Amino acid sequence: LEVFTHPQAGLQKPLLDADTQRALAGELNAPDPGARAVAVSLLGRLGDGVQTDLIVGALQDADWRVRLAALQALIDQGHPEAAGATITMLEDSAPQVRSLAARSISRLGTDYAESLAAILEDPDPGVRAVAATGVGGIRAQKTLDRMLESDSPADQEAALRALASHPDLTELDLVRFAGHPDRRVRAAAAAALAPLAGSGPAIRSLLDDGSVIVRRASAAALAQRADGPALFMDVLANGSVRATEAALQSLADTGQTGEGLTEWASQEVARAAFLRRHRLALATSDSSATRTVLATLLASRQERLLRWALLATTTPHTADMMTVVGRGLRSADQETRAQAVEALESVGVHAVTRSLIPLLEETGHGALPDSRTSLRELSEDHDEWIRALAVRCITEELIDDLGHLRGLADADQSGLVQSAIARWEVIAVQDTQTLDTVDRVVALQRVPMFAGIDPEDLERIATLFTERRYDAGELIFAWGAEGDEMLIIVEGEVTVSRPQEGAEVPIRTVRSGDYVGELSLLRGQPRAADVTAGPEGVRGLILRGAQLHAILEERPEAAMAMLATLAERLGTDWNR
């Protein structure tokens, strides 16, 4: 009743009753600093001002987290004592507390500038940078310029973050920091460049950065600029996958829409339908390892394009609905897909909806082409990896055909048949001695830990491997030996065994498309088993420990897949 009869409309700030206030006051003496910090924070947010003495007392707490919460509580309350207490906290031992105090004072106006001038030489770069923005003028410029010219990435990052909101405090060229080796400095540079004229191309280049935090910072910076929409559209037309992802997410977060964006989304859906059609065509014939990788690539490209199209038509108001629409479009149930299309139509993206129809039909638009026709069309695609895999599939078919011709030449002595075959005798198919880039990527995509990684990224990862061959029966890894290598099996198989009472006890056989030796790498312990090449020998790719750890750190999905395989193997070995 009190809620509905309150004279002031809208949400009301809840007030502490006496019992709750006593409970929170008691928590200020709790042994856990986390509990004390929460208590003082609640007193600041929910209190009516009479708890100020308790909050001021918490500024003397031994734990910096409690002091930080107490200072924030005073600032939020806007209490008359807040300014004096904040100035006192500029001398706190914790940089987090000093930084909050400096930020608060910098908002109070020039009357407090001299208080901040005293900490322009603070040991913490974040505190110095915040103090400089509050002091302003030539002293601030000298402080920030010194930080930018220092060799410390922490100094440079802090100065750049301060300049994002105070670009007038330096005359130095900030574009050079877009190429800094430290990703945090590059991210801060993107924010600092946002308000500067002529910096659009430099910020745009950071959309393709290898670090996700830099890409996000770059997209956020472009979204603030007048030329941001034009630069985003240029990225969608010509940018890399990473740049496109960052641009689309920023457009969705900021709610930017337009006819050009809708047209682009329609084209992406049409492209997805084209890829799906060829994927279905390839599924009608026998599948080699390369065809399997090509089909997987077509499916992942199709999924990516559909996701991009939905993201391009998403606004903050429709984000939740678009998530549901996306699930519906991917459903195996035809009725669910139809309902998803209707939902998409209801938000007014008619061009995208029309483009979706061929993508959702059972066989696309019209009859499917035969697999050879599909491969020929895909061999002329604008996507480099689709072309490469299609050409490799065609090459493999030609090799099979030539093998068939040679068999005919040996079996059929008809002069007419021999004459027909003779023109092909000049073509010699040689067994490649080393694996090329396509071979390596195809081999890696057969391995579960790499199956979810795009060929473009696998192309770089493949350079970390060393190719090796092992003869039949050759010992690859020895029980008890130190191990800093794992083996991806490309051709052949290996036997994993353990010596026991003078004999080798087989544990399992590992075939092509799998790997061995990873456990010793991960644990840093000697080999727990012998690994021996099978009767046909082994062709494989060796990966050293440092490279494996780098891959797992960069690609969490590879780490999860490796853990799943490891758990399965340990379970199998335990049952033995």
Give the residues covered by each predicted segment:
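Core helices of alpha-solenoid repeat scaffolds
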Residues: 17-21, 52, 83, 113, ...
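Alpha-helical adaptor scaffolds
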Residues: 359-383
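Extended repeat-based solenoid scaffolds, especially LRR ectodomains
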Residues: 266-316
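Catalytic cores of nucleotide-enabled group-transfer and carboxylate-activating enzymes in metabolic
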Residues: 236-242, 261-274, 278, 291, ...
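Cyclic-nucleotide recognition modules
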Residues: 505-564, 568-571
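Structural detector for internal amphipathic alpha-helices that build alpha-solenoid repeat scaffolds
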Residues: 1-16, 26, 34-48, 53-57, ...
